[in-house]
Amino acid sequence: MELRLYNTLTRSRDAFRPYDPSNVRLYVCGPTVYDLAHIGNARPVIIFDVLFRLLRRTFGDQAVTYVRNITDVDDKINARAAERGITIRELTEETYHWFRADTEALGCLRPSVEPRATEHIDEMRLLIERLVASKHAYVAEGHVLFHVPSMPDYGRLSRRPLDDMIAGARVDVAPYKRDPMDFVLWKPSPEGVPGWPSPCGIPERGRPGWHIECSAMSWRHLGETFDIHGGGIDLVFPHHENEIAQTRCAFGTNMMAQVWMHNGFLTLEGEKMSKSLGNFVTIRELLKDWPGECLRLAMLSTHYRQPINWTRQGIGFAAKTLDKWYRIVGDEPAETGEGNPFEAEIADRLADDINSPSAITHLHHLADVAEHVDASSALKRRFKGAANLLGLLNETESQWRERQRQAVAVDPEAIEALIAARIAARKARDFATADHLREQLAAQGVVLMDNKDGTTTWEVAR
């Protein structure tokens, strides 16, 4: 199996060859912890979790380091803490735990390291001082700024004309800047705002700019150069472009990460998601109505580089698919590893630039094989193991049913009693009573599915 990944830097799908196969290193930009994560934030979390799983399968569990940072110093954090009347630490701790609970509900593995920006201020100062010493940055009015013209191939990642970059960066053309494109590495902290001793002999307290945070954390945990850097397409410019500039100029390297991966935008029911349009949806809100696994399957049904239109219909289809798959595997354990040919077939499809739609299509085929009346327990275990590579079917059927019921406001025992009465009526050929009971359940929003084996499963129509 050859792993091929689309590299934003080269604009091509290239064979992935890590610097060191025994030490594969992945960095992904994580959340700024000031509010609940929205469904758009879930996309990179899920996509790079699948990549993490695939890398572990390919190179070994202990050979892969996945770093996803936590930005806990930011002007939005300061403003939200003041608005709520709580400390910045209280806000960031609360929001981090919300984010962690949401990602666990989505079936994501924890990254190897989740570094916090506030724990890496020393590394940021060191990087900044290196940049000033090498004439790639300068001090001006209590700020330290990166001098963009000092890097001849700045813009190589985004490939945007200079005028577009100036507009896209929404730069503040302050009078102390040597060039309009220069960006902040360090800035003064006014009274009441978090601050630390400044680098470069600046006497006033200050705080880091956004871009230097990721350069410092990736350097600390992965080194001067590493294998893969990921994030949303909106981060290509200016954030990732500026990360590259800082890191390469600080260490004199010709590369920061050899592969840059970016997931596409998300729209909600065909519209851009925004609070002003009233269609801003958090992961937490969706988890009230759906198990996280439904959200995961719906997200993976579109290739990560393509835009995705997030719809309730899509989540509903994912729920029906998972209901069928769990019914097939029952409470069988998963068979994982090199001995599972089904898992290898899914891995081959994911190796083609994380082609999750192709992998899911093949899972539908494998489900039909495992559902066959003569299918052995081994086939079901292999099917479940194959789905596990996508982070799916991680529970038993019993756990799945219970999770479905927890997500809806119905009385499961009362529903099961009505279903049992309907089954008894059908066996007695009392179809009028059976139909009446089905209608009674439908009035509560309960949809019944009569299975080939004579059992009946149910779900709540949303």
Annotate each PLM feature.
Residues M1-Y34, V45, D49, T58, ...:
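Alpha-helical recognition segments enriched in aromatics with Gly/Pro capping
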Residues T10, Y19-G107, W458:
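N-terminal, positively charged nucleic-acid-binding surface of large information/translation enzymes
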Residues Q62-T65, K135-E141, A370, V447-M449:
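Short, well-structured beta-strand/strand-turn elements
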Residues R68-T71, T118-R125, F237-P238, I315-A319, ...:
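An alpha-helix initiation/capping motif
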Residues I70-V73, T95-F99, L109-M124, G142-M151:
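Short, glycine/charge-rich beta-strand/loop segments that flank catalytic centers
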Residues A81-I88, S112-T118, G232:
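The substrate-binding groove and active-site-proximal loops of carbohydrate-active enzymes
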Residues K272-S274, G278-R462:
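Structural preference for alpha-helix termini/caps and helix-kink/transition segments
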